[in-house]
């Protein structure tokens, strides 16, 4: 097993395919409604289409930064145990639900805003890769502080209304 050259692993067609997938993050109104019908029963509060678009934008900016985004159950649980401040974003179409059903309770206990997004595939694309993601934790950063504050305030009101 020799080392691969960069030319072998990252050809231009693969990069353009990922760019097309990321560009497809915006969904039409009826597509979004169809995705919302596929979510599991515990997916509350579920982001509306406009809020989901802002959350995707926040995730893209956080993914570009360093150490501002955590992905996956283990990493997010570690951040929550450390009492880090941030926003928790969960995918709504995860099966079985038992995998991450305890996360909203932890977020409420630690007063961390959280929201469900209808599709784990789109959550993965927002991070910048093709693999689906079920759970993302975004920490505040000076690079995108204004957008972070806006989304956090909206999520805080969403969480209070749903309780």
Swiss-Prot record:
It comes from the Eukaryota. Component of the small nucleolar ribonucleoprotein particle containing H/ACA-type snoRNAs (H/ACA snoRNPs). GO terms for molecular function: box H/ACA snoRNA binding. It comes from Caenorhabditis briggsae. Belongs to the eukaryotic ribosomal protein eL8 family. This is Putative H/ACA ribonucleoprotein complex subunit 2-like protein. Gene3D superfamilies: 3.30.1330.30. Keywords: Nucleus, Ribonucleoprotein, Ribosome biogenesis, RNA-binding, rRNA processing. One of its GO terms (cellular component) is box H/ACA snoRNP complex. InterPro entries: eL8/uL1-like (IPR050257), H/ACA_rnp_Nhp2-like (IPR002415), Ribosomal_eL30-like_sf (IPR029064), Ribosomal_eL8-like_CS (IPR004037), Ribosomal_eL8/eL30/eS12/Gad45 (IPR004038), Ribosomal_eL8/Nhp2 (IPR018492). It is found in: Nucleus, Nucleolus.
